[in-house]
Amino acid sequence: MSDASVEVLLDDFENKDKWELAGDGAGRTHLTTFAEGAPSKTPGVYADGVAGEDHRALVLLVKSAEADLEVELVAKPGQSFSIAGRLAMVNLWVRSPHASIRVSARLGGEHGERELALGSIGAGPDWQRLGHEPADAIADADLQGLRIRLTDVVKREGEVMILLDDLTVRTTV
């Protein structure tokens, strides 16, 4: 059996067409794009032949933000983020200048739903790559959405901005 793995781009977040908001914070959140991709990374050309763009990032603007507010980014009906093969890692670039956040990915598939904690970042100006490597690879999963929980809000007036870029998975056969 081969141990070869490949990284596949699920979304480069150049537009918001594939996503909608859900969860407790959806009514306080606006989804848009911003002319800033993660500058500290070089856009990759992934195993599926898709090249990541770095012109725009997906942005969640949260009004009246407070600690423990949760916003979900879910795939729009008819939009599929199927992961062929065995999921070995999920990665996401994140920048959150106004709040500390915790991010997780929600997966579905033959074996039911599960949530993978991608990680936490403190409020700051820099892009950071979050990721999760499950103990055992997950076969034939679908990425259903991302959950973002604000853990500490440092900006008290206006909207809290959370930027997302290049959602990728590493798969094995």
Task: Give the location of each predicted region.
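Beta-rich carbohydrate-recognition modules and glycan-binding surfaces
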Residues: 1-173
